[in-house]
Amino acid sequence: MSISSDEAKEKQLVEKAELRLAIADSPQKFETNLQTFLPPLLLKLASPHASVRTAVFSALKNLISRINTLPQVQLPVRALIVQAKEPNLAAQQDSTNVRLYSLLLASKGIDRLSLQDRQQLLPLVVSNISCLTGTVAARMFHILLKLILEWVAPQESSHEQEEFVQFLQLDNDGFSFLMRQFTRFFLLVPSKQVQVSQQPLSRGYTCPGLSLTDVAFFTYDAGVTFNKEQLNKFKKAIFQFVCRGMAATQTIEQSPRMIELMEFLCVVSTDSTNLSDDAAQFMKRFPMPYENEEFITFLQTLYIGNTANGRPPVKAILQEKILSILNRSHFATTKAECISLICSIGLHSSEYKLRSLTLSFIRHVAKLNYKNLNPASSSPSSTDFSTCIVSLIRNNLHAEGWPKLQLGPQTPAFNTAILQRQLQYETLGDILKRDFELVSDLSYIEFLFESLKNDLPQFRSSIQESLLSLVGHLSILPQQSKLKLKNLLRKNLSIDEQQREDNNDAVNSIMALKFVSIKFTNAAFPFHDPEARLFNIWGTVRTNRFDIIEESFKGLQPFWFRVNNASINTSATVKTSDLLGSHLSETEFPPFREFLQVLIDQLDSEAASITRKSLNNAVRFSKQCLISNAIYGKKTMVIQDEDWSVRIDKALELDDTVVSRVNEMVQGMNDDIFIRYLTLLSNEFTATNSKGEQIAIFPYQDPIFGSVLLTLLNFVSNNVLRRLEILVPDLYHLVIMKFQSLSDNDLAVCATIIGIISTAIADSTHVKRITKIAQSQTMAETYVASYVVPRLYLKDQTNHIESDSILNLLNILTTHLSHPGTNKDMILKLVCQVTKFGLLLQVSAQERKDFLKKVMDTIQDKLINDVTAIQTWSYLSLYSTDLENSSLFQEKLLETNVSKQNDFLFSVGESLSVVAGKWSSKYLIKQIDIPNFNVEIMQQKFPATNVTTILDEIFSGCDSTKPSLRKASCIWLLSYIQYLGHLPEVSSKCNDIHLRFMRFLADRDEFIQDSAARGLSLVYEIGGSDLKESMVKGLLKSFTESTAGSASTSATGISGSVSEETELFEPGVLNTGDGSISTYKDILNLASEVGDPALVYKFMSLAKSSALWSSRKGIAFGLGAIMSKSSLEELLLKDQQTAKKLIPKLYRYRFDPFQAVSRSMTDIWNTLIPESSLTISLYFNDILDELLCGMANKEWRVREASTSALLQLIQSQPQEKFSEKMLKIWTMAFRTMDDIKDSVREVGTKFTTVLAKILARSIDVEKGVNPTKSKEILDNILPFLWGPHGLNSDAEEVRNFALTTLIDLVKHSPGAIKPFTPKLIYDFITLFSSIEPQVINYLALNAANYNIDANVIDTQRKNGVTNSPLFQTIEKLINNSDDCMMEEIINVVIKASRKSVGLPSKVASSLVIIILVKRYSIEMKPYSGKLLKVCLTMFEDRNESVNIAFAISMGYLFKVSALDKCIKYSEKLITKYFEPTSTENNKKVVGTAIDSILNYAKSEFDNVASVFMPLIFIACNDEDKDLETLYNKIWTEASSSGAGTVKLYLPEILNVLCVNIKSNDFSIRKTCAKSVIQLCGGINDSIPYPQIVKLFDISREALSGRSWDGKEHIVAALVSLTEKFSQTVADNNDLQESINHVMYTEVSRKSMKYVKKILPLYARYINVNPQEETITFLIEKAKEMIRLLGSESDDSEGSIKQTSDESTIKRIKPNTEITQKSSKENIENEEYVINLLKVSVDICNNSKSRYPMNLLEFIIDEIAYLFHNDRIIHTWRTQLAASEIGISIVGRFSTISSADFIQNVGRLWDQTFPINCNKETIENVKLQMIKFGGLIIQKIPSLQNNIEENLRLLNSIDSTSRIELELKNIGL
């Protein structure tokens, strides 16, 4: 077959390329050829001709073999990658092979590249990587992995990191592609198949989270496989590359890149390597995007997997991570399909944690988006999903063991299992709570009840909570379910826990079951359901837990039942009034008959035990049902509020409506159930029958049975009573057999019941037996007879009673009464029974009279304190017509007023009503307990006779001044009107009664007030319309008019006139120590004795307050009672004047500090004013005026109430209403803050706080307030706040509050306050000193007295200013101000700094200057001069802290000052330092100022450095150590190089020295001299000659004149100069002569003290240039000085001795040689001489011409003098110095020949050795002497023998190892 020309051509090209590559004979050539030919060769793989492609493949095979053998050869990697991305081919050519082989060889080449080269390839590889497809993309991605494998991450948050991100140039598509693949790579797991090298790669395996295609991308398509180690290496590299490279700079929340990064980190955070921790930490840097759709969808997809592309769900650990995120996402609850799959996967998982998280997720969805758990909203494929979930959870619970958890091998750890099961129960509850359909068939409720009963205790609370969450559904259950629920609850509540007492857990489970059951009962069934109420009654069994009992009683109390049910109503919005129960409505009770039927049926059933145990509460509830049924829909006192229980208990005693309604109802009852019920009550009451058999079924005693039975018998028909005859034997048997053991109450109840039944069966044998009374019968029989016979008489049934039986009964009673051993109280009660029903009318008048007398005689003395005796006495009075002295009855009763017991007095009141009204008294009428009795019969027999008489007596008691009688009379009057008010004799006197009660309202005794108030309401009820009107008006008048009227007897007169004898206080109320104040006269006397007539008014005010106004409860009670029933609204509408007076006062009284008063007033307000807010709005101005007026009242209670009321008022009304009176309000507010009374001040503070907030709101321009209006308000208020009522007030509290208010205004309303900035800054600065506590000021002034450093206190005071909120406020003001205010602000700051007195204000001024400089640096320039001047002026302040503060401010000011100003004030600072009057403080301040300038204005400092640096240099040598430290610090910071800086500023330094070294201030001279010395150390010969001469001139001139303390420093300076510039001095004869002359002059001075100091300096000077005459002069002066040294001390010692002789007062220690030797003075003299001699030795050693032998002799003579004189006693110092001087003298020469010199040295040895060779001499001295001897032996042989002999002698005297060693060293 012929070959086409194209094919041949191409083939030829391939062969040529192959040949070129093959003939390359070195690796370098091979590499070069590869760079050229390899990419084009690979392009030929796209040839359409198979032969060409085959040739290329063949060539490649050879090439690759050769490349493999040459590892150093580099491949053209970049060209290959470019070619792989965009091969240079024709459009129709297939580029696949070209790309793949290019990448294959590129991948090989990468391994050979350096790290740097690899990094350079990264941008190329990642660019457009997202556009590549299939295998090419896979291989390119693998190349990227290889490139980043050894990539070195840049430093975190560094510039390099940012540069790297820029370098990558990654677009959004590329970023997304890489992040997607990197994330998937972390899901990759190694293949389990072992890969053999020859075997082709496997393509078919999946990983959790990755499909076949995904896995193939990383392995098959890329042509690689990974083992675990390689995989981990790549993962690590990827993580580094992503987090510290590619995505390092992602900071924008919710951006796509950030979301992709978070997806990546989520996956990595569960990786099996330690990268998971790093990823978790890295994630914390960013907020989790819980609500980002893309992010959440990605996680859901990972969790669920994808069936469409075959991607399985991820591993469980990652699923757990995903769920923990979904559990916090709202968006995750919005996709129903995803939710169903997530829950299904999680609940079917074998992983415990995943199951738990799934349960949490279900709860999360149920809470936020329940409908998505609901099948209706799910897709058709997941129908019934919600049901499916709960079924799944229930199945799981069954699988784990149900109803009790079973632990088996499959169960996780115990704690884990417990937690998960708890979560399952809670999740079940969450779902059921939201899905009524699941609850309606009760199957889950049954399931949970069973679990609660039987599962482990650990789950109890979870199950209970789940059950209780369902109560909202129960009321809407279908009827069938409700019946089922009722059976379930009946079963739960009737469980007898006592059978399982041994198992505590079981008992607790039953209790939990019962608690939930009671909750269900209350929620599911209406209140009128008798069975449900019976369940509640079962819950009250006393063996139940307290919470069950409490919940059960709530189900039996209609108020709490309503409140409870309102709170569990989940379906509708519930009113707050219903939740609080404040809106009262009437709840219907179960019908009485139905309830009885249910109760009796239960008692007859098999499970009767629970009913029996709760029978007492069943009976109690049955009584409540009866009453409630009877009065349903009627107005009575039984209101269903929280006190309903008390109301219903007392209703039959107090409310006639209730009695009549119940009577009607009970009269119609005659059925068997009712009789059965009454029999049951009787059986429970008697407990045993007449045969002694037990008939009670309730296990305990309870008086309720007897009490209810008696109550019912009061109303039943005669027919019923006759049917109850069978009860009489048992009841009679109870009294007879248990007479001694029964309580009085039970006896009375039992006898009364027998008495009532007897009236219907008078002819029965039982009654006949009881009424047949014999003298000999027992007390028990008498007891019953006493109850039965009088009732039979009432019913006119006595014809069956034998005539003597009644007489026998009376005789028995009188006999027992007179017998000492009997129970008198019981007998008297029987006498009451016999007498009150008129039985005595059955016997003859004489017999009656005898009986009455006997009883009266017995009880007459007991009346004062015995209630029974009092009652008996009143009943005896019924027969008073039979006695001569009938008035005795009332007299005896009236005498009981002395009693202090209120209850007793009420009993007397009841008795008085009987004495006065007989059977007309309501009290007596209520005693009738026989059904349907006509009381008029008795009223005819016992007509009322002396009603008026006794009423007049009571009036008289009311008007009495005797307190006890008044109190008793008040109570009696109340009883009188209560029980006899219906009689015309009483109602005709209503005016008088009303007046008495009005007066009692003013009584101090709260009980009397309450009684009087109640009395007023009763009077009001019985009065006519005219009376009612006048009463209301009178009360209002008394309430609104404060003036005390004259005495009045009309209905309106409350207060009487006060005369001298009017008793305002009970004795002892105002005890002063001298007796008590009882009358007006006493008050006058006391006031005049104190000398303050004004006290009279104070006491009068107190009296008024005590009587009426301070105890308004009385009037409030009265008002409340009257007003609740009167049409006061009409009255107020008609009478505007009254309304205007009453409403403001009443408003104020609502806030009275006394709770009782405020409570009563609030009641009145609520009663009187239906529309409170409307009324307040209408009468706002009147109320405001009343309150402002009240705030200034002299009575503290009025002030406090007014303030509290105003506080409430201004908070509830718009500001516009009171804006005009704002100043007045503020004034009064501040006045209350300074009140004398604590409580008023407290309320005042609250009030002003609220005012401040209102003010802040009203001026807040930022919140939209009109700026003009805001300014107008502030124009009014601010002058007030900073005026005499505010900041300048005398009261500290007011000042502080005004300040706080201003600070708050600045803080919260900066815009509004801006125009007032300058004034406020001035006020605030000056205020600093005022608000500083006085104690600190005192302490600062008296610091020395307390040993405290005043500077320390001042520092604290300064810190206090800086940290003060006030200063921060100033700062805020400045920050908010404008440039245009600058001049004004600066002027006020200058003014404040000048006018301020205290330290804090001055310091504040300086700090404000600093703030101004910082904030307005440019604007400040024109004012810098003024401010610098202020600073300089403030340097003169007496307080150092103030000086320092302004010095620091000066530093800041330099920053904004012009150069001329800087120079001017720099020079002023220099002048200030060198002033002759300058103190250390001044110098310190100057130093601080310079330091501040250096720190805060560096460039300005540099401009004036030539002014400052000389001063700093000189001041570094100040005598004061602190100053020296300060200036040294400044010098160090200011000078770039020490010596260089000195040279730089030397001319200026010399100028300053020249001017100041002759200063009048010697300390400055001294400082200058020290500076010269320091200069010598800092300069050298290179400085100009004129400057050297100038230095000498300065020093010489300074020495002219007399000697002064410190002049020696100038001498030292001159000597230092001479030493430094010795050559200059030697070359200049004139200079040398002049210095010689000056030195000679100074040494020749007469002041020996001065000469002593400069003599060593003179010796140093001679040492520079020794001359014979100067040496001779030195010897002369030195000798003279040494001889003088001891003489001073001799003189002083002489004087001491003399004193000692003259006086024996103080003993002086004897001045022995030892004490003198160690004295300071001796040591100083000795050291001085030694120093002088050593300097002299230096002169000898430095002599350049002839050796000064005379000086040597002088030295040796003086050493001898030191050893042997008695003025300076030598010590070891001289001994040591002698040897050292010897060593120095001998050691200078190598050989010594001078005989004089040798002689002198010998003399020195001879002087030294004898002194030093003692045993006592210290070792160091001896060692030094041995060295000296060794030198002599070495240099002067002629003295050798003598020396050696001496040294051997020394060794023999005191031989030590060190001495022996030293001797050995010198050859001995």
Swiss-Prot record:
Which GO terms of the molecular function aspect are on file? ATPase inhibitor activity; molecular adaptor activity
Subunit: Component of the proteasome. ECM29 binds to both proteasome 19S and 20S particles.
Q: Which residues carry this modification: N-acetylserine?
A: S2
Q: Which organism is it from?
A: Saccharomyces cerevisiae (strain ATCC 204508 / S288c) (Baker's yeast)
Positions of HEAT repeats = 32-69, 116-153, 256-292, 313-351, 384-422, 439-476, 590-627, 707-745, 748-780, 781-818, 846-885, 945-982, 988-1025, 1030-1067, 1137-1174, 1178-1215, 1272-1311, 1361-1398, 1422-1459, 1503-1540, 1544-1581, 1649-1687, 1746-1785, 1830-1867
Its GO biological process terms? ERAD pathway; proteasome assembly
> Listed GO cellular component terms?
cytoplasm; nucleus; proteasome complex
Q: Which domain of life is it from?
A: Eukaryota
Q: Which residues are annotated as modified residue Phosphoserine in the UniProt record?
A: S1692
What the entry lists under SUPFAM superfamilies is as follows:
ARM repeat
Any further remarks? Answer: Present with 2950 molecules/cell in log phase SD medium.
Q: Which UniProt keywords apply?
A: Acetylation, Cytoplasm, Nucleus, Phosphoprotein, Proteasome, Repeat
Q: Where would you find this protein in the cell?
A: Cytoplasm; Nucleus
Instruction: Provide the function of this protein.
Output: Stabilizes the proteasome holoenzyme, probably by tethering the 20S proteolytic core particle and the 19S regulatory particle. The proteasome is a multicatalytic proteinase complex which is characterized by its ability to cleave peptides with Arg, Phe, Tyr, Leu, and Glu adjacent to the leaving group at neutral or slightly basic pH. The proteasome has an ATP-dependent proteolytic activity.
Q: Which family does it belong to?
A: Belongs to the ECM29 family.
Q: What is this protein called?
A: Proteasome component ECM29
